[in-house]
UniProtKB/Swiss-Prot annotation:
Active-site residue numbers: 2
UniProt feature coiled coil, ranges: none
GO biological process, one term: proteolysis involved in protein catabolic process
Protein's UniProt name: ATP-dependent protease subunit HslV
Keywords: Allosteric enzyme, Cytoplasm, Hydrolase, Metal-binding, Protease, Sodium, Threonine protease
Location(s) in or outside the cell: Cytoplasm
Function statement: Protease subunit of a proteasome-like degradation complex believed to be a general protein degrading machinery.
Family, similarity comment: Belongs to the peptidase T1B family. HslV subfamily.
Length: 174
């Protein structure tokens, strides 16, 4: 699977992801880019789950952003509705972590859109490890959002067999 982590702190929101792609018990690729910018670079997003499924969802989410003039929450809710009700989309297996200058959200295939209380998102197989590391760093250091994401991904990469230490990181400043 993968690890995606997002942290919001001091006017910065960052999403980072590892690069490992596995097929069964074989590592197929180590430098996949699972985080990208959307909607005129105003939204950042990362995915955990099937790569082809995630690219389909990125495309659909970007269309929703265009339709709703970049309103992140509205676009996320509309994507989640479609994902839950459309027969073809229901078969897609992925999670999205998305953020803009105002909100950080998790979008699931069950039709859930979750905004975490503490603006910390960690999804994928290494998510619990990255979340624990990020929470400890948020509560006990003055590190910036990018440093916390980098360190959390590194820790998850050391622990989770489906996560590696290759990192793709995107950041928005607001």
């Amino acid at each position: 699977m993968t690890t995606i982590v997002s942290v919001r702190r001091d006017g910065h929101v960052v999403i980072g992801g590892d690069g490992q792609v596995t097929l069964g018990n074989t590592v197929m690729k180590g430098n996949a880019k699972k985080v990208r910018r959307l909607y005129n670079n105003k939204v950042i997003a990362g995915f955990a789950g099937g790569t082809a499924d995630a690219f389909t969802l990125f495309e659909l989410f970007e269309r929703k952003l265009e339709m709703h003039q970049g309103h992140l929450t509205k676009a996320a809710v509309e994507l989640a509705k479609d994902w839950r009700t459309d027969r073809m989309l229901r078969k897609l297996e992925a999670l999205l972590a998305v953020a803009d200058e105002t909100a950080s959200l998790i979008i699931t295939g069950n039709g859930d859109v979750v905004q975490p209380e503490d603006d910390l998102i960690a999804i994928g197989s290494g998510g619990p490890y990255a979340q624990s590391a990020a929470r400890a760093l948020l509560e006990n250091t003055e590190l910036g959002a990018r440093d916390i994401v980098e360190k959390s991904l590194s820790i998850a990469g050391d622990i989770c067999i489906y996560t590696n230490r290759f990192q793709t990181i995107e950041e928005l400043t607001y």
